Every structure is written in C-alpha cells, then in structure tokens.
Curated annotation (Swiss-Prot):
Region called Domain II, residue ranges: 64-142
Region annotated Domain I, chain positions: 1-63
Family per similarity comment: Belongs to the RuvA family.
Gene Ontology annotations of biological process type: DNA recombination; DNA repair
GO CC list: cytoplasm; Holliday junction helicase complex; Holliday junction resolvase complex
Database matches in Pfam families: HHH_5, RuvA_C, RuvA_N
Spans annotated as Flexible linker: 143-149
NCBIfam families in UniProt: ruvA
Annotated protein name in UniProt: Holliday junction branch migration complex subunit RuvA
InterPro entries, per the entry: DNA_helicase_Holl-junc_RuvA_I, Hlx-hairpin-Hlx_DNA-bd_motif, NA-bd_OB-fold, RuvA, RuvA_2-like, RuvA_C, RuvA_C_sf
Subcellular location: Cytoplasm
Amino acid sequence: MIEFIRGYVDYVCPEYVVIENNGVGYQIFTPNPFSFQMNKQQQIVVYTYQYVREDVLALYGFHTRQERMLFAKLLQVSGIGPKGALAILAAGQLEQLVEAIEAENDQFLCKFPGVGKKTARQMILDLKGKLQAIVPDAFPNLFTEPLEETNALSEAIEALKALGYADKEIQKVVPMLRQERLSTEGYIKLALQKLLK
C-alpha cells in the first residue's frame, strides 16, 4: 500500500491530478482536483488510497489522512463505490457528514450527490459509532461539547420527549441544535420551530 506521494502537481483536470515524482507521473483521482491547482509546480504531499479490483487499479488522493480514512469507511457501505465516495467528500462538509451519521439524520445525508434514502440508512447502519476514532484531530469539537451546553441540550431533548415527540423525530433536529449555543429553553423553542415546519 502506498501511504503518500510527495511530488509536484504537473496536471489538473476535472477528474484527477497528475503528481510527478522522480520522473514518474501518478494519476490520482481526488474529490476536488482543482483544489490542487494553486499548488501547481510546487511540491506537495498527497495521502493515497490504492483501489484494486479484478479490472481496476486506481489511486485516490486526499489532502489529509482523515479525509482518506473517511473515504475508506464510505467504501465499506453497501451501494457506495469510489465515485460515489468521492462525490460525497467533494461536497466539502466532512464534519456535518459525520455529525449527521452519528445523529441518524438521513434527511441531511440525502443532500449529498448520489445518496438516496436507502443509501443514507445504510450509511447510518454501517458507520454510526465507527467514526469517532477518525475525526477527533480534524474536528476536535465534534464529540467534545462544553458540559454546560451538553446539559442544556440533554434537558431540552428530555423535555421534547415529555411533550410526546419520538426519538426519531428529535434526532432529525439535533444536528441543527448542536450548531447553536443556547439555554435549555432556547433549544426547546428552536426544536419546536423545526419540528412544526
């Protein structure tokens, strides 16, 4: 397995980049090839994933190890291949992607290219609880919320349950609530606005 390639950006097109290293040009498929355009003729490091099947041998490349790990995890989901995984990562919402999986927010996941209801549910089934080890360095605040905020949000969730809302309904709005810094009452008001839409 090739961990990374250090070289110069020789060529960029909509599907891939070519990284030149010691006279060899490596064709590397990436989520956003043009994000490498600014580094043209500069030495960079691309973290690679080697994809091997009977009729396919391809290199996929990423700016960070975390991005590469998410790509590898997405490939484990039934119904998602390399092109689909690249399209999801190309949306550039990695933190929101992980948060939506953890919160079982299939509506948000369906916003990603090529992800329908069935694939979104499969992503949650296959990946929930398996991404925390990948993302702490990249998204330090995702799994470590301030205690005061966590308590306020927890109290709001309990209040919504007491009002008769099901866990499934509540979990759909939790990612939106986590983006705010509110009191318990503030979280409840915001949640009700979202739930009553």
